[in-house]
A protein has these predicted regions:
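Short, solvent-exposed loop/turn segments at secondary-structure junctions
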Residues: 72-75, 90-93, 151-154, 207-210, ...
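Short glycine/proline-enriched coil/turn segments at helix->beta-strand junctions
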Residues: 59-62, 79-84, 214-218, 250-255, ...
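SAM-dependent nucleic-acid methyltransferase catalytic core
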Residues: 16-59, 104-221, 225-230, 345
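Long, positively charged, glycine-interspersed low-complexity recognition regions
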Residues: 238-350
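Residues lining hydrophobic/aromatic ligand-binding pockets adjacent to catalytic sites
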Residues: 171, 209-211, 224-246, 264-268
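SAM cofactor-binding core of SAM-dependent methyltransferases
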Residues: 63-127
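Intrinsically disordered, low-complexity proline-rich tandem-repeat tracts
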Residues: 2-5, 10, 15-17
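A short helix-to-beta-strand connector/capping loop
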Residues: 82, 194-200, 277-279
Length: 351
């Protein structure tokens, strides 16, 4: 097992230099010039880590890109494999993306829907939000799901034991401003254009069923719920589930990579010990937010676990670019926190 830690000095001024190139004829590794942001928001979304993931994996792209924990879909929407099997146990995410794929939902339907209900929300405040939430739990309408996803507290996506959405209202004035609606519509339109050019299947299925479809030329990317942290997983996720997953992925006939948190300032994820002797691990430091205040920013070390033979060794000298992108994506960081985070240079060690 090789554990690689990505830390570099903070540049004085952030200037992104994007190549947008793949290496040879392979799909991965590559660097993505413009990150596609999905219309669905999830906690733990990998927007800031997309280029880190895409540039760390080596895969020819001859088979299917398989994701058993799709979540927002941000990784798949940026990897852009010609063929993909994208699954989640959350039927509402899958239903929304299927309807966008079939063009039953497009930017115009989203614009009209959000403008109408956004105006009523502004007048009715929390009461109207809870009316919409109750209506969604009865009808499962994908547009209502999108509305709740953008109007709920802190972008949470949480369901009770009966499968009902139960996140409270986000008391933010002018929640569905003209600019915000345009942003969501653009995200829907971008995704729809992608789906017109690829052969992707969206399914509601447990992860066991999904990875069982993998063949030799495929690649499985896994972003399971983080043990010990709140997650958006539609069903429960236990330590026993995680152990079962670690056993089964080591039996896959194809390449795989798994995202996981390694440690934060409070503790270390001991579950990662299941991969230390069999896989290569690349780590990446970044901040996550649990609120608008600077005091609520926390650093976390993310790990990308990769099957031997499927990692891009040349990527290890290019980590500076990904860190520059993260700084550009998050202008709320203060300079002291940045300098503390990037005080060390890239280094390797063997276990």
């Amino acid at each position: 097992m090789i554990l690689l830690r990505a830390k570099v000095p903070l540049p004085a001024k952030v200037t992104l230099r994007i190549t947008g190139n793949t290496m040879g004829n392979s799909l991965l590794p590559k660097h993505i010039k413009h990150i596609t942001v999905p219309p669905v928001k999830c906690q733990g979304i990998k927007t800031k880590l997309v280029n880190f993931i895409a540039s760390s994996i080596s895969w020819e792209g001859k088979g299917k890109w398989i994701e058993p924990f799709l979540g927002s879909g941000v990784t798949a929407f940026n990897i852009l494999a010609p063929k993909a099997l994208l699954a989640d146990t959350n039927p509402h995410i899958i239903n929304l993306y299927r309807q966008i794929q079939k063009r039953e939902i497009d930017r115009n339907t989203v614009k009209e829907f959000l403008e109408f209900h956004g105006a009523k929300l502004e007048k009715g405040d929390g009461d109207y939000y809870y009316e919409i939430r109750e209506q969604f739990n009865r009808t499962k309408d994908p547009l209502l799901f999108l509305f709740l996803n953008r109007a709920s507290f802190n972008g949470l996506m949480r369901f009770n034991a009966n499968g009902n959405f139960n996140v409270p209202y986000n008391h933010k004035p002018n929640r569905f401003s003209k600019a915000y609606i345009s942003k969501i519509c653009n995200q829907v339109s971008t995704l729809q254009n992608i789906l017109m050019c690829v052969d992707w299947e969206f399914i509601t299925a447990p992860w066991e069923h999904t990875i069982a479809q993998a063949n030799a030329n495929d690649f499985v990317y896994l972003d399971p719920p983080y043990i010990g942290r709140s997650s958006d997983y539609y069903n429960s996720w236990s330590y026993e589930d995680a152990l079962k997953l670690s056993t089964q992925i080591h039996s896959l006939p194809c390449g795989y990579a798994m995202s996981m948190w390694l440690k934060n300032k409070f503790r270390t994820n001991e579950y990662i010990d299941n991969f230390r002797t069999k896989d290569e691990i690349l780590t990446f430091n970044h901040f996550y937010h649990i609120g608008a205040s600077e005091t609520l920013r926390n650093s976390i070390v993310e790990a990308l676990i990769i099957k031997p033979g499927y990692s891009n060794k040349q990527n290890f000298g290019n980590v500076k670019l990904y860190l520059q992108e993260e700084i550009a994506l998050d202008n709320m960081w203060d300079k002291k926190s940045q300098n503390d985070l990037y005080s060390q240079r890239l280094h390797r060690f063997h276990r």
